[in-house]
């Protein structure tokens, strides 16, 4: 089974910790391993901070966060209404190395280091940046012996059955 949620947030700094807290709460309720939850929440914070800083658009002063948990996979997408990425500004693998004196790009660099797969693109025809990242989930152990979690496939299924 799976679950997903979508938020439309005002493009203000206070929205970043709100999105992060909602993701952490959803991950905790689903039984996702705390280290994985933290990594995803940090990546989400960086993507939201980028949307707040760069996502000013003529059509909307909001941005959208969508999170999908499906089996062992989590996909998070942050989309804004700003000008989008400059053509040619991002190579296919984003920033394999970040120069020490770089004044921007750290957010995408962090997202890439925390997630399994990252995709950045512009919305077709309307402008706006879209950052999507995926991560394989691990689960908190549920039978009380305190052992760390494996993947849902290793434990015989998804703990999201009750959540979805």
Question: Which stretches of residues belong to each language-model region?
Answer:
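Conserved beta-strand-loop-beta-strand hairpin that lines the nucleotide-binding pocket
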Residues: 1-6, 52-164
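HAMP-domain connector/hinge
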Residues: 6-12
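A conserved hydrophobic position in a structured secondary element of the catalytic/binding core
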Residues: 11, 32, 135
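Short, structured helix-loop boundary elements
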Residues: 13-16, 37, 41, 108
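Conserved short strand/loop->alpha-helix "switch" segment adjacent to the catalytic nucleotide/phosphoryl-transfer site
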Residues: 23-45, 100-102
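Conserved polar catalytic motif of the HATPase_c/GHKL fold
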Residues: 46, 50
């Amino acid at each position: 089974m799976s679950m997903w949620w979508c938020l439309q947030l005002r493009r203000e700094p206070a929205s970043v910790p709100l999105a992060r807290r909602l993701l952490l709460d959803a991950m905790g309720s689903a039984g996702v391993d705390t280290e994985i939850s933290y990594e995803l929440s940090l990546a989400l914070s960086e993507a939201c901070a980028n949307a707040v800083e760069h996502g000013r658009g003529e059509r909307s002063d909001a941005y959208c966060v969508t999170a999908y948990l499906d089996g062992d996979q989590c996909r998070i997408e942050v989309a804004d209404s700003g000008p989008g990425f400059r053509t040619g500004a991002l190579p296919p693998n984003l920033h394999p190395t970040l120069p020490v004196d770089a004044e921007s790009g750290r957010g995408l660099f962090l997202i890439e280091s925390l997630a399994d797969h990252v995709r950045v693109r512009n919305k077709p025809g309307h402008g706006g940046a879209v950052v999507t990242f995926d991560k394989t989930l691990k689960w908190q152990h549920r039978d009380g012996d305190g052992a760390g979690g494996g993947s849902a496939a290793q434990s015989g299924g998804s703990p999201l059955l009750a959540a979805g």
